[in-house]
Each structure stands twice: as structure tokens, then as C-alpha cells.
Design a protein with these regions (language model features):
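Glycine-biased low-complexity/repetitive sequence motifs
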Residues: 1-184
């Protein structure tokens, strides 16, 4: 995170960085290696693991920010009937700068409408200030109630709703980000 001086003419992230070394990078008018991370690439059948791919890292000089964790996959079959392997259990989301949202489950192997413990952990690897937050947990429900992915300023929400009809089975919202505006 950037450090905002009281005299600088821009708006900084509300997650302020450290004003002193060693966590500070002082910049001068020269070239710096910069990599802008990308979102995770999709997976498609017949992959045996449908957990989403994680995003790639972003780099500025010596500072690396981890990409977000891939989301968990849906597990189970239609109308609560488990499908053949490998679609029997919902996968756990992956850890990352922000954690991925946990997959949903539609199976008789867990009580209906039970939250699953399958969210991805944010701020992985752990650093200070934090890179991001945890994803939300998925749910055992008929209508694909996955958890939301974590954001920079808040975690992803758990899936909610009764889970027996489409309008009442709700996936979790993704966590909020933060804004920075540097001009001049």
C-alpha cells in the first residue's frame, strides 16, 4: 500500500502503508520492473479438479502482491442426488492475496442449508499491511449457493437463503475493493 503524506495532491487507499523502512519503497526517476497481475484462467472439462485457477501476482520493484485465490467448484447432482465422481463434493477455494469463494454442494451427504467450511484464506502469504481478505463459505443447497471472493477492504460473504428454490438460494457477494487516485 502507498503511504499518503498530508501535503500530497492525491487520494490514497484507506489501507495506508508503512511510512518507514523496511516496508517502504522510495522511488526515484528511473526504471522499475512492474508486472500487472491477471485474473485466473478458466478451467473446463474434463479436468479432474474444477477449482478455479488463482490470479497471477502483481509486482512493483521489490514488492510482490499475491493474486487472488481461485473459487471452489460446485459438487453434487441435480435435486439433491449426488452425481458420479468427481462431482460428489464441493471443493475448497484456494488461498491468495484475497481468498476465493467456497463452492456449493447439492448432496445428501451434508444437511441441507448447512454452511460449508470451504472458503479460501486471504493475505496468503501473510504480510502487513494485509493484501486482502478471506472468501465466503459455500452452502449445501439446491441452487448453487457459492461464497463470494474476498476483497481488499472486506471479506467475501457466505452463501445465504433457504436453498430449496432459486430466488431464496443466494450466493455470497464479493468483498469490497479500495480506490486510489494519483494525478499530477
Amino acid at each position: 500500500r502507498e503511504v499518503k503524506s498530508t501535503v500530497t495532491p492525491y487520494t490514497a487507499s484507506p489501507l495506508d502503508g508503512y511510512p518507514s523502512a523496511p516496508n517502504r519503497v522510495t522511488v526515484t526517476a528511473t526504471s522499475y520492473p512492474i508486472t500487472v497481475g491477471a485474473g485466473g484462467a478458466p478451467k473446463s472439462p474434463p479436468s479432474p479438479n474444477f477449482t478455479g485457477n488463482s490470479g497471477s501476482n502483481s509486482v512493483f520493484s521489490t514488492v510482490t502482491s499475491a493474486g487472488g485465490g481461485g473459487g471452489g467448484m460446485y459438487g453434487g447432482g441435480l435435486a439433491g442426488v449426488p452425481a458420479p465422481a468427481p462431482f460428489v463434493t464441493a471443493s475448497t477455494a484456494l488461498n491468495g492475496g484475497s481468498g476465493g469463494g467456497g463452492g456449493s454442494l447439492c448432496s445428501g451427504s451434508a444437511p441441507l442449508n448447512e454452511l460449508l467450511s470451504n472458503k479460501g484464506t486471504g493475505n496468503t502469504p501473510p504480510v502487513s499491511p494485509s493484501q486482502g481478505n478471506n472468501g465466503g463459505n459455500g452452502k449445501n443447497a439446491y441452487y448453487y449457493s457459492a461464497g463470494g471472493g474476498g476483497g481488499a477492504s472486506s471479506g467475501g460473504a457466505d452463501a445465504s437463503g433457504a436453498g430449496t428454490t432459486a430466488p431464496t438460494s443466494i450466493g455470497g457477494a464479493g468483498g469490497n475493493g479500495v480506490a486510489t487516485s494519483i494525478t499530477g
